[in-house]
């Protein structure tokens, strides 16, 4: 740490600001996971009819009612407006800080750089059967109150920050209980369209996501294309739109366009492992093993994107291309290479059924050959 950093390091105070509605199933778990790191808890309730408020009162009396007006940003900005501490932390009711991440937050709180305007944290959003993190993205999670940063967007809102932004290795874990196909967000978008509102490039992209989630693939493709055509989307949304369009075309059994939009993702940035793995899987399915090997090998040699807010499928950046290379090399008779890649995959997921199966298979192959 240099002298300037030493002088600016100090203990900060934190307001936790949340918006809730009928969160009785998860709110207590969320607050227990983070309360010890906060100096103030602000809860804005948008119309709970369950026991949410009663549960929250165990942790704070700063509970404010806010009428639901189909605008998430308005509700979050209302929550932020009640904060009185130096920094604001925000969470959703189905998020938690795992014990290790709570300790990291407490350490950051004691040794924060007071010149930083916003800290990013990882957001772990999906997991495999073994509990390993599959998808993660970065969020501006802890922000200086005096900067008055604002939330933007009625749905799929984002916190617009500027100034000095530092990344952390703290993770917030999403632990959603029920993965339903709620129509709420889609309804908000369609009501806005019915009123004649012009959608921003970001709105076009997220409306397409809602259509995609509701299996309205043709219309989703239309709006993804509109988003791309603006040439104004965030690069990560452009890349994601390409992948989601490829998924839509796959659902429509259109392999030509599926490949077209997979390749198109490369025009927005250096290739991403997720898309290389898509291509590897495509050629593996066609038993074109050399082409599959090319794409999986490229995946394992890529550098992760530098943007801390980029969404990553961790499997594609770690074990998945290796286990697929194992399959490819095995099919062309390169057993030693297959074993090597299986071992690398095993270092990431030692108890995965595919790893265990492969170990047994290769033991038999080597035994037979000897």
PLM segments and residue spans:
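Catalytic-site signature of metal-activated, phosphate-bearing donor transferases
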Residues: 2-5, 13, 74-80, 86, ...
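N-proximal low-complexity "stem/linker" segments adjacent to membrane-targeting elements
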Residues: 1-33
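Conserved donor nucleotide-binding strand/loop of the catalytic core
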Residues: 54-82
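A conserved acidic beta->alpha catalytic loop
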Residues: 33, 37, 45-55, 68, ...
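Acidic helix N-cap motif at the loop->helix transition within catalytic regions
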Residues: 25-28, 50-59, 100
């Amino acid at each position: 740490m240099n002298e300037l950093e030493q002088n600016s390091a100090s203990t900060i105070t934190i307001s936790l600001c949340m918006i809730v509605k009928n969160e009785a199933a998860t709110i207590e778990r969320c607050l227990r996971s983070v309360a010890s790191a906060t100096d103030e808890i602000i809860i804005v309730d948008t119309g709970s009819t369950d026991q949410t408020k009663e549960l929250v009162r165990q942790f704070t009396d700063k509970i404010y009612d806010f009428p639901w007006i189909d605008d998430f940003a308005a509700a979050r900005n209302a929550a932020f407006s009640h904060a009185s501490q130096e920094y604001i932390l925000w969470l959703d009711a189905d998020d938690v800080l795992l014990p290790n991440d709570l300790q990291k937050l407490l350490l950051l709180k004691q040794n924060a750089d007071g010149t930083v305007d916003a800290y990013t944290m990882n957001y772990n959003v999906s997991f495999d059967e073994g509990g390993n993190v599959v998808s993660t993205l970065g969020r501006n999670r802890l922000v200086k109150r005096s900067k008055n940063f604002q939330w933007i967007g009625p749905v799929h809102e984002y916190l617009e920050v500027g100034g000095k932004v530092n990344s952390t290795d703290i993770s917030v874990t999403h632990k959603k209980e029920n993965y339903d196909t709620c129509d709420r967000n889609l309804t908000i978008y369609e009501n806005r369209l019915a009123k004649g509102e012009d959608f921003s490039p970001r709105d076009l992209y997220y409306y397409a996501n809602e259509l995609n989630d509701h299996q309205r693939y043709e219309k989703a493709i239309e709006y993804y294309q509109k988003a791309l055509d603006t040439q104004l989307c965030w690069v990560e949304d452009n890349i994601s739109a390409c992948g989601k369009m490829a998924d839509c075309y796959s659902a429509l059994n259109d392999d030509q366009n599926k490949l077209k939009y997979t390749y198109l993702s490369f025009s927005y940035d250096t290739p991403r492992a997720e898309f290389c793995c898509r291509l590897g899987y495509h050629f593996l399915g066609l038993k074109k093993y050399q082409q599959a090997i090319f794409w999986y090998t490229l995946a394992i040699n890529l550098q992760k994107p530098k943007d801390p807010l980029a969404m990553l499928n961790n499997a594609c950046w770690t074990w998945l291309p290796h286990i697929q290379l194992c399959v490819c090399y095995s099919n062309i008779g390169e057993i030693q290479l297959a074993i090597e890649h299986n071992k690398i995959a095993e270092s990431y997921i030692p108890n995965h059924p595919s790893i265990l199966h492969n170990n047994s298979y290769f033991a038999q192959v080597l035994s037979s050959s000897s």
